[in-house]
Amino acid sequence: QRCGEQGSGMECPNNLCCSQYGYCGMGGDYCGKGCQNGACWTSKRCGSQAGGKTCPNNHCCSQYGHCGFGAEYCGAGCQGGPCRADIKCGSQAGGKLCPNNLCCSQWGYCGLGSEFCGEGCQNGACSTDKPCGKDAGGRVCTNNYCCSKWGSCGIGPGYCGAGCQSGGCDGVFAEAIATNSTLLAE
């Protein structure tokens, strides 16, 4: 199931952002330019740039006044939320898992997108970057991950959008995450 304009106006669960392409997640690909609903940066300004407003859902307020997770929000210059000292997952939090099968970044924050699910991802729906698809003998990805048009496994628009070869293409994986959220919640 898609979100936003592509999903008949549907909103993402847990205040995740709906990207310009109609997929749910967190990070720049989802909450930045073109974000349709959820914790969009354009609509969720914070800190000194927004009269001291705080971010919803315990997100960090970056030095530039945008809400989100990861080093660019919770690191140097962070104005509010779980700034560096309040780690949420992974080895920085005693092996704690993220809710809803979100990825735990190398910095110990929960979210979706390459900054969370890519290199250094500790747990959750991490991108495996294993070869798949027609150039890998028809290999499919595990855990219903999407096989991108370039032949790598992962989730998000870059994997499950246009050209997706197999797995949870067109946002089916995001729907599965939302469906299983009660099983994975803290």
Curated annotation (Swiss-Prot):
Short name of any one Pfam family annotated for the protein: Chitin_bind_1
Removed propeptide positions: 172-186
Keywords: Chitin-binding, Disulfide bond, Glycoprotein, Lectin, Pyrrolidone carboxylic acid, Repeat
Entry annotated with the keyword tRNA processing: no
Glycan attachment positions: 180
Residue ranges of domain Chitin-binding type-1 in the record: 1-42, 43-85, 86-128, 129-171
Molecular function per GO: carbohydrate binding; chitin binding
Database matches in InterPro entries: Chitin-bd_1, Chitin-binding_1_CS, Endochitinase-like_sf
Annotated disulfide bonds: 3-18, 12-24, 17-31, 35-40, 46-61, 55-67, 60-74, 78-83, 89-104, 98-110, 103-117, 121-126, 132-147, 141-153, 146-160, 164-169
Domain of life: Eukaryota
Residues involved in substrate binding: 10-12, 62-73, 114-115
Annotated positions of the Pyrrolidone carboxylic acid modification: 1
Coiled coil: none
PROSITE patterns recorded: CHIT_BIND_I_1 (PS00026), CHIT_BIND_I_2 (PS50941)
Summary of subunit composition and partner proteins: Homodimer, u-shaped.
Record's miscellaneous remark: The 4 sites proposed for binding to carbohydrates (N-acetyl-D-glucosamine) of receptor molecules are on the surface of the agglutinin molecule.
Function: N-acetyl-D-glucosamine / N-acetyl-D-neuraminic acid binding lectin.
Record-given protein name: Agglutinin isolectin 3
